[in-house]
Amino acid sequence: MKKIALLITLILVGLNFNGFSQEKTKVFTFKIDSDIDPRMTRRVSESLKEAEKVEANLIIIEMDTYGGAVNDADDIRTMILELDIPIYVYINKDAASAGALISIACDSI
């Protein structure tokens, strides 16, 4: 038991020392929470541009969609793949059809 407590303490102390040399991470979030259609494509495009503008280090998409138009999903997928900022997706209930295609393009699900 004492060994486990010592190990946890060492890990926490190590994390604190590593934190001094790191820059603050800017996380940009937005939702995909309706049908994948031209309006959602515009919304995602504007969100990704805003993330670049604020110099975000990470983008998190909260997704809850049953899908939609595959051509719009492909446009969103292309935007995600071409962006240099890592993008994580949090699937909050559903990512069906076009939503799954978009999720797979992200760096982490």
Sequence positions of predicted segments:
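Sec-dependent N-terminal signal peptides
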Residues: 4-13
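Soluble extramembrane regions of membrane proteins in the secretory/endomembrane system
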Residues: 19-109
